[in-house]
């Protein structure tokens, strides 16, 4: 039973692998960083996503894919309350336990985990436009120190 494990080949990771002479398992495929849309597609098409990213909570909740966060702490209590992601830390037995739990999660259009209400906002582009327009002069004056 073959499981592919694509991992983003960012410079920092590549340097760590090389400097520590780490031999990767043949199932781990280092890939060039993806565009955001390609990255989201990869996540949606995966059986489970293992990540240490802080945004995995929003992505998993909105796109409804199985996700395991490898951190031990996080800044997204609202997502943990809805159980959109299982938090495992780095211990092998906790990671395997998390993957086993995630097998029961529906994905795609069928849901058994609620989307986090804070992430299910209507009229986002309308609101962003109004916020930007409201702060243009303030940002130009305070941040960029432009005179009018």
Task: Please annotate each region the language model reported.
Residues 1-148:
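Nucleotide-activated sugar donor-binding and catalytic core shared by glycosyltransferases
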């Amino acid at each position: 039973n073959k499981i592919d494990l694509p991992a983003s080949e960012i410079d920092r990771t590549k340097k760590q692998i090389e400097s520590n002479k780490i031999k990767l398992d043949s199932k781990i495929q280092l890939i060039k960083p993806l565009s955001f849309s390609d990255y989201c597609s990869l996540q949606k098409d995966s059986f489970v996503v293992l990540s240490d990213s802080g945004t995995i909570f929003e992505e998993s909740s909105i796109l409804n894919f199985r996700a395991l966060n490898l951190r031990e702490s996080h800044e997204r209590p609202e997502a943990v309350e809805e159980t959109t992601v299982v938090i495992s830390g780095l211990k092998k037995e906790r990671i395997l336990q998390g993957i086993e739990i995630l097998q029961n999660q529906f994905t795609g259009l069928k849901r058994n985990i609620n989307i986090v209400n804070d992430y299910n906002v209507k009229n986002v582009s309308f609101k962003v436009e109004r916020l930007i327009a409201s702060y243009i002069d303030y940002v130009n004056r305070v941040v960029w120190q432009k005179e009018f």
